[in-house]
Amino acid sequence: MELEQSFIALIEQSIKTNWYLNALTDYKGITLQYRDVARKIEKIHILLENAGIEKGDKIAICGRNSAHWTVTYLAVITYGAVVVPILHEFKADQVHNIVNHSEARLLFVGDQIWENLNEAAMPHLEGIIELKDFGVPVSRSEKLAYARDHLNEIFGHKFPCRFRPDDISYEKEKSEDLAIINYTSGTTGYSKGVMLPYRSILSNVLYCKEKIGLKAGDSVVSMLPLGHVFGMTFDFLYGFTAGVHLWFLTRMPSPKIIAESFAEIRPRVIACVPLIVEKIFKKNILPKVDNKLGKLLLHVPIISDKIKELIKQKAMEVFGGNFIEIIIGGAPFNAEVEAFLKMIDFPYTIAYGMTECGPIICHSHWTELKLASCGKVAARMEAKVLSPNPSAIAGELVCRGANLMLGYYKNEEATRQVIDTEGWLHTGDMATIDEDGNVFIKGRCKNLLLTSSGQNIYPEEIESKLNNMPYVSESLIILQQDKLVGLIYPDSDDAFAHGLSQSDLVRVMEENRLELNKQLPAFSQIARFKLYPEEFEKTAKKSIKRFLYQDIKE
């Protein structure tokens, strides 16, 4: 599918148009204007050129979110090379494997990651460059080392009469050219490299421009890892082409850091995973109304509306009080928290997608979102549910269109397993679609639990209810010997703060189990529970690695 516009042209135009505006800020650290970004892009181009990098070569980036991470990304993509973003949470052997599998010729790396890497395990690299100052601790090329030592001098010779907007002219891409190889967080073995062409990036960015409405000078806080396409697309790529001021928290945000930074920055759009929203609402908002008086007043006409408005204002303030909408994605959203947000008319929306679609498949503006859905299929995409009755009987959701990947890098067999002969991507998610086109995700196909009586059980639906019960931090539902077992990581700090002993906590969890079973049909009731002392291990997008918890001991 050919798109008339050019993604590289959008980057170039944004830099030229917003030359004197703030572009990138490390929270409590450096700020770069768009003109500073342009200068650093040119300097990185000098390093790439002297390292012998050619168009189409792979360049890996591994580090925490930062201004220099995004500058490096922009430099690589405007040079015509292929970006290989690597999640900073990956272990050293995973980083080594991805660098080698992708055939990356350079690795840009954060200092905390670099400390744990072994350059000998990545023998094909021309060099390793530090993100913080673009130093070159490892160079297998004399020209690269010389270029770094004389970078300002070379830049001065290249632009002797002051660097100006007119000096910027990036080569435009071809729609099907490979832009990114994004290695999925993957829960088994080494992850697969998703090949995203410029077509996919451009289509995703254009969709955001059409639906979200950021303007030059708006502020956006980047919380999601830029190595994952959700944060990369919604925060960074869309934001930069719109001329926004992008702030990086540079570390995993706690509710305290979020409240502090959002109050100062007052972002216009917030993209985050459900876990962040759920924690804030369960800790700061729901306790104020989750009592007999609160529930009573919420059902009294006139008073109810005023209370809802007060709650909404309080919730808005937690996120800075200036945003158009909060875009939630990356994992299932707690149904009871969502129902509460809907009740107070809070401006949230659900986005659904996959790395393989860069990532957008479904999304609707918050004013159009139907409760429990993830919106409608995005522009330039089509989707269907493989079911005899898609509105009533869940089936696998498949999609195709402009956002779709080229395939998995050097893995044709894996590509054939997910993209059929008609070009449909099999998402692995069970869903229904109503008559208005709203998509409802029921759970992962691979997570579906099938009992001996033939009943299909979606564990995510039960977990959503259980996670909202007293002192439950997170949970997993598994099937053992044809019985459902609830694995629970309790909120022990909260329980002990309320004077509960360990035996009290066990008693409360049993009460939770009995109360939950009253809300469930007989075939999906929990037979027993098991408490876990530590939170469940997760992927980068905060999905629990379920495969680790399928074989539990008494």
Would you name each region that the model predicts?
Residues 268-271, 281-369, 473:
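Gly/Ser/Thr-rich phosphate-binding loop
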Residues 377, 384, 391-451:
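Conserved ATP-binding/catalytic segment of the ANL
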